[in-house]
């Protein structure tokens, strides 16, 4: 999205093209600094000459977020950037995976997210459950956001192969204070759930700068009742009818029948995962400018979450009692339910609760001489100080688990899990050369213990602090890197950026325990330490063909090492049972991007061809080359993704003050070679849509009023790998619950600036009430927003 409301004159546009593609472009290539064109941080200092940029950058400013985007979370601010989407299934979703050109909606370790250079990405796993820690940034403190596409900069790790998001937060230059209140809600209708789900958000912040000292203090509170995230469903028992006395007859008037993703009939029995989340963020930043050329800043962020996941059963017996569950482990008559003469089991109607407190510490030291040499140090520590999750195991069919007598269940304690990062970088400006070199260190630590087994659950799912050990998983990974990158202005129209990143990775202290393992399989496994080194070269050549036309070709390799959980944790995931494999090899990505950017009299048009070959891709699949077959996360020999992205920014379209920004992306992603499951060769990589599009139209009616109408589209994609057993994909019915469906969604927002201090806005997301899903979870339906803001 464009950074500015008014489109500059032609000469300025030509200069912008030169900045983006050929000239010294941006400190965005550094983890902690904004682009020179960003209106995101005003410090009053002299800005150093920028580091040339080898990749495409798209950005959105705080002003654009305020006037055109309905969001109360940092993740929501990215939804109109080209080929970019955050899997935010409801407001306050902790599993909001960042999706860009080439990664799926459950591949969280293939993109990288920073806030002021501090890493927010959670590389403990590559899963829907380890999304970036968006909650550490309040949307009101965002000054601007930039996205970088591809592994073309040596300054970032191999996890950046899918892309990089850099959030820059506010740094005050004088006293300022802000207060904002948001209300939002939806009337949600799906199956047997017809209800209103609403919430509120409040934030307050203040900052100041006096004699070189500056500070920022903010608090953010979110309270939201989310809509159901899953719907319990079942199919009829085959074979002999259930024995007399083992079943409960269910009133068929309450039964909801449906067709699943495979085109088969099913019965919807319950709604679950109805999450009431209360999240609080406290952020404190303190900095000091020792001189115009040296600044230090410390950051402390605390995020707390209290979540209650409730359930609702649609089934009633002849007396009107709610029937929650039925299965083999229950006493008669709740081994089955009988509906119109057919017998069914009913499961998954289990409530949950989680309590979390996470701490983030950051330190930035940066020189800013603007001369021949500058340097920067960024250190961060993320600590899951408390992370407890509880799930009930109902003891009979009429017990929801939320009554006066609490049944048993499971408790998972991930407290102490976390990561730390350190980067030290220098920049040398030597005539036609700008040289960046640095060192990097990171360490990730997994601690996860689950108490309560099927036969010996914890005594009280809400109150017990321990119980029979079910599983535990421990392990650490560490990466150390050296990198160098040289930007050489060969001639006024030619810029060559070349670099490389040498990484040494090791995995150690890995172990897990599973009470369910029976002899001869050991219950406790301890894994040998591993180490590996890789080199990733980068090359980019830019050419300013004319004052308004710029070209760039970029080549880059990225190495994405296995996460701690992929190697050392055993867990269940959608569509497959995934087991750990400590011998997994790193993904090796070779990417290309070919860019043409044309400045127009009233804007910009960019076209990008992108290409990615991924070797040893880490994917959950079934290994059919061994007997018995093994379903787990495995290395797949080769994946290929290629596509075209077109983006544009236009100002004063048809009438003064009407700005249009948009993008269209086509991608084709297939499995090229898979020795462990050859039947998958030539089939689609799941969760990569064929088409994506965005369009944002903002009319600045006056200095006080603006109105925005936006559009989001995502096309066909599969929710799982090709099913070689049936010779077809599992989702021929792709737009129902359980699928990763397409969507076509309109949003609108009206902003009114009452005066210099006060403003208010009203908005609607999903104007058409479009129903769409991300296997299996439904996205929000029509959602209304209202906001009131005060700025001092």
Regions found by a protein language model. Give the residues of each.
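Short acidic/polar hinge/loop motifs at secondary-structure boundaries
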Residues: 120-151
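N-terminal periplasmic "start-of-domain" segments of outer-membrane beta-barrel proteins
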Residues: 36-69, 94-97, 125
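Gram-negative outer-membrane beta-barrel transporters
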Residues: 180, 489-496, 504-505, 602-614, ...
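Surface-exposed extracellular loop regions of Gram-negative outer-membrane beta-barrel proteins
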Residues: 445-454, 458-463, 504-519, 529, ...
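Outer-membrane beta-barrel signature, preferentially recognizing the C-terminal barrel domain
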Residues: 346-360, 368, 470-479, 527-536, ...
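Face-selective signature of the C-terminal outer-membrane beta-barrel domain
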Residues: 287-303, 345-514, 542-544, 606-609, ...
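Extracytoplasmic beta-strand/coil segments of soluble accessory domains associated
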Residues: 75-119
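Transmembrane beta-barrel wall of Gram-negative outer-membrane proteins
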Residues: 195-310, 357-370, 431
């Amino acid at each position: 999205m464009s950074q500015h409301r008014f489109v500059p004159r032609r000469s300025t546009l030509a200069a912008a093209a030169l900045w983006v593609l050929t000239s010294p472009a941006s400190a965005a290539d550094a983890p902690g600094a904004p682009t020179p064109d960003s209106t995101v941080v005003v410090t009053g200092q002299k800005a150093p000459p920028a580091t040339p940029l080898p990749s495409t950058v798209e950005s959105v400013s705080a002003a654009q977020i305020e006037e055109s985007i309905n969001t109360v979370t940092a993740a929501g601010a990215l939804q109109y950037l080209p080929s970019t989407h955050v899997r935010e299934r409801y407001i306050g979703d902790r599993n909001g995976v960042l999706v860009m050109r080439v990664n799926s909606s459950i591949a969280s370790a293939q993109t990288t997210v920073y806030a002021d250079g501090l890493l927010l990405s959670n590389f403990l796993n590559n899963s829907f459950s380890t999304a970036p820690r968006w909650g550490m940034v309040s949307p009101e403190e965002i000054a601007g956001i930039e996205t970088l596409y591809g592994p073309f900069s040596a300054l970032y790790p191999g996890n950046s192969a899918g892309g990089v998001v850099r959030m820059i937060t506010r740094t005050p230059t004088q006293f300022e204070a802000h207060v904002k209140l948001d209300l939002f809600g939806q009337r949600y209708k799906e199956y047997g759930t017809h209800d209103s789900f609403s919430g509120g958000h409040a934030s307050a912040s203040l900052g100041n700068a006096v004699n070189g000292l500056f500070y920022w203090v903010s608090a953010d509170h979110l309270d939201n009742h989310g809509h159901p995230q899953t719907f319990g469903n079942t199919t009829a028992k085959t074979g002999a009818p259930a024995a007399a006395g083992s079943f409960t007859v269910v009133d068929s008037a309450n039964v909801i029948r449906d067709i699943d993703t495979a085109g088969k009939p099913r019965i919807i029995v319950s709604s679950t995962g109805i999450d009431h989340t209360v999240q609080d963020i406290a952020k404190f930043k303190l900095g000091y400018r020792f001189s115009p050329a040296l600044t230090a800043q410390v950051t402390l962020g605390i995020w707390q979450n209290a979540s209650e996941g409730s359930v609702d059963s649609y089934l009633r017996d002849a007396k009107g009692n709610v029937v929650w569950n039925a299965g083999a482990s229950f006493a008669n008559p709740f081994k089955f339910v009988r509906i119109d003469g057919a017998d069914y089991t009913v499961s998954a109607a289990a409530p949950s609760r989680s309590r979390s407190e996470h701490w983030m510490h950051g330190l930035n030291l940066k020189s800013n001489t603007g001369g021949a040499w500058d340097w920067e140090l960024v250190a961060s520590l993320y600590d899951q100080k408390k992370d407890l999750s509880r799930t009930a195991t109902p003891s009979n069919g009429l017990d929801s688990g939320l009554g006066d007598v609490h049944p048993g269940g499971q408790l998972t304690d991930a407290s102490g899990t976390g990561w730390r990062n350190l980067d030290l970088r220098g920049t040398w400006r030597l005539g036609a050369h700008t040289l960046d070199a640095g060192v990097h260190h990171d360490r990730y630590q997994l601690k996860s213990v689950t108490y309560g087994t099927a036969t010996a659950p914890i005594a009280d799912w809400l109150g017990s602090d321990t119980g029979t050990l079910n599983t535990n998983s421990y392990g650490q990974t560490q990466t150390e890197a050296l990198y160098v990158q040289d930007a050489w202005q060969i001639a006024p129209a030619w810029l060559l950026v070349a670099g490389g990143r040498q990484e040494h990775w090791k995995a150690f202290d890995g172990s897990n325990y599973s009470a369910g393992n029976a002899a001869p399989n050991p219950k406790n496994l301890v894994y040998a330490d591993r180490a590996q080194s890789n080199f990733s070269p980068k090359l980019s050549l830019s050419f300013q063909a004319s004052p308004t036309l710029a070209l760039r070709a970029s080549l880059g390799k990225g190495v994405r090492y296995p996460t701690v959980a992929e190697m050392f944790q055993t867990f269940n995931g959608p569509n497959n049972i995934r087991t750990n494999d400590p011998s997994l090899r790193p993904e090796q990505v070779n990417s290309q991007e070919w860019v043409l950017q044309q400045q127009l009299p009233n804007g910009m048009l960019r076209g990008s061809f992108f290409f990615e070959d991924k070797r040893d891709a880490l994917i959950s699949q079934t290994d059919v080359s061994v007997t018995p077959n093994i379903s787990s996360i495995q290395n797949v020999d080769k994946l290929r993704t290629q596509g075209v992205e077109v983006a544009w920014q236009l100002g004063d379209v048809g009438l003064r003050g009407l700005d249009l920004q948009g993008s269209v992306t086509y991608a084709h992603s297939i499995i090229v070679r898979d020795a462990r499951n050859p039947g998958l060769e030539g089939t689609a990589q799941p969760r990569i849509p064929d088409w994506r599009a965005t369009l944002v139209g903002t009319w600045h009616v006056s200095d006080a009023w603006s109105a925005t109408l936006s559009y989001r589209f995502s096309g066909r994609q599969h929710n799982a790998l090709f099913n070689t057993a049936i010779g077809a994909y599992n989702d021929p019915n792709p737009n129902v619950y359980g699928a990763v469906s397409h969507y076509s969604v309109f949003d609108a927002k009206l902003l009114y600036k009452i005066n210099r201090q006060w403003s208010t806005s009203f908005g609607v997301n999903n104007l058409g009430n479009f129903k769409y899903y991300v296997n299996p979870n439904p996205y929000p339906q029509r959602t209304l927003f209202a906001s009131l803001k005060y700025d001092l």
